[in-house]
């Protein structure tokens, strides 16, 4: 069973869950749209974009799409430098928190797979997964911009 403190934390968090999820979803959509316009990004994977192959399904089934997106860096971008240049968005395996986090699946969640298997699954060295938090979307975009500048 849960401790009284854990129950209190859970109860307190549930009161703001809808607000936090809505902020994450809104921020993710804004960032996904911004990334599609960035010439240093070759592809953006976000079901809220009309260009996503499953957008019509997501539109029917989801309310807000998600706070998670992935994007592929152009080959000219050094992924490690990009990740290390981020200041507000933190490299982390943690997902769906109030703070934005990012990781390279090829180095984290899929690191134990061989290169051939990762390639079959669409996991390249330049693929990044961004879990968008509730920070101001303009601050997140500024952080991404400066990381692109430093890594190009």
Regions picked out by a protein language model, each given a short descriptive name:
Residues 20, 77, 84, 100-152:
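PLP-dependent enzyme catalytic core of the Aspartate aminotransferase-like
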């Amino acid at each position: 069973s849960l401790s009284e403190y854990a129950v209190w934390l859970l109860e307190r968090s549930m009161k703001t869950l809808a607000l936090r999820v809505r902020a994450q979803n809104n921020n993710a959509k804004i960032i996904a749209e911004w990334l599609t316009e960035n010439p240093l990004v070759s592809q953006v994977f976000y079901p809220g974009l009309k260009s996503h192959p499953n957008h019509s399904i997501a539109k029917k089934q989801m309310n807000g799409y998600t706070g998670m997106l992935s994007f592929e860096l152009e080959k000219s971008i050094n992924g490690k430098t990009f990740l290390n240049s981020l200041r507000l968005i933190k490299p982390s395996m943690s997902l769906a928190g109030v703070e934005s986090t990012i990781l390279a699946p090829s180095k984290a969640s899929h690191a134990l797979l061989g290169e051939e298997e990762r390639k079959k699954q669409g996991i390249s060295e330049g693929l990044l997964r961004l879990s968008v938090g509730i920070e101001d979307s303009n601050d997140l975009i500024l952080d991404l911009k400066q990381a692109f500048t430093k890594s190009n």
